[in-house]
């Protein structure tokens, strides 16, 4: 399957990406920080999910996992608006199997 995961540079997002890669899936990670995963089947997009104008055109995904999040004054823009933007751009199409939202505080 083709999987898109936001927030893959560390923590939960990185662990989820590693698990999908171990199972042989193709993973695209989006994060503000540079690539931290160096494995076959992984593609990294370094960008801020708040900037919808920079969302690249990508082939459809089977699974979209919204994991990126912050705990500061930008929380609404990242945790809510960024999640909505990613879901609208990549998670709404025929053939999508799942869209997951991860949140923590």
Residue ranges of each PLM-predicted region?
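Conserved glycine-rich Rossmann-like NAD(P)H-binding loop of the short-chain dehydrogenase/reductase
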Residues: 23-37
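A short, exposed helix-loop element centered on a Lys and neighboring polar residues
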Residues: 87-88
